[in-house]
Structures are given as structure tokens and as C-alpha cells.
């Protein structure tokens, strides 16, 4: 005797929904971590050179960080810029955060996730 009828389609749908909810929570967590890094003056340090929404006392050396997803539709381009902008522009003042090991690959990806929300 089965107490619960077997409904494979329902079980699959519930599993997919649960997986999507976990993925969304992880993405939000990464964005929060990226925001912390971007505003941390001793680590990501974006505010030293860039103005961005929610940042206090921003610098004005670099461009304002807004409409990032529209300006950089290719996420990998933004990752490469943060990792080592000198490859694209040898005269840049932007530190090569990845090449100099200021930020890890995971931290750069978190910052990019955050910047894409601006």
C-alpha cells in the first residue's frame, strides 16, 4: 500500500524549483560579497577611483560605474579589465588586481556580479 501516490512529474518540478531557488540565493550571496569587496578600501577599493551608487566619498580618476551590463555586455571583458587592464591599455592607472594577486579570481567574479547590477 502506498501512502503517497507517485507523481514523477511533480517530483521533478519540485526538484527543479528547489534547484533554481538555491542558485538564486547563491547568486545574491555573490553579489553581496562583490559589493563588500568593491566598497572595501583595503581590498577591492573601487571607490578610490570610481563613483558608484551607494558609495561614499568616491574618487574621480576612473569612469563612473553605472549601466555596466549595457556598457560591458560580455562579462568576460569586464573580468579581464579588473584582472589586468594593462593588457588592453598599457597606460592605464587601474591596478592589475588579478595579476598582482590583490584579488582572487573568485573575488573578481563576485565584484563583476555586483557591478552588473549597477
Language model features by range: what are they?
Residues 32, 63, 92-96:
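Positions in alpha-helical segments
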Residues 1-28:
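N-terminal export/targeting leaders of redox proteins
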Amino acid at each position: 500500500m502506498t501512502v503517497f501516490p507517485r507523481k514523477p512529474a511533480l517530483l521533478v518540478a519540485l526538484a527543479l524549483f528547489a534547484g533554481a531557488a538555491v542558485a538564486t540565493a547563491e547568486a545574491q550571496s555573490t553579489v553581496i560579497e562583490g559589493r563588500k569587496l568593491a566598497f572595501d578600501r583595503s581590498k577591492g577599493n573601487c571607490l578610490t577611483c570610481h563613483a558608484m551608487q551607494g558609495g561614499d566619498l568616491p574618487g574621480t580618476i576612473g569612469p563612473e560605474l553605472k549601466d555596466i551590463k549595457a556598457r560591458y555586455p560580455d562579462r568576460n571583458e569586464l573580468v579581464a579589465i579588473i584582472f589586468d587592464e594593462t593588457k588592453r591599455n598599457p597606460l592605464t592607472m587601474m591596478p592589475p588586481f588579478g595579476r598582482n594577486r590583490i584579488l582572487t579570481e573568485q573575488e573578481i567574479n563576485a565584484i563583476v556580479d555586483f557591478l552588473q547590477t549597477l
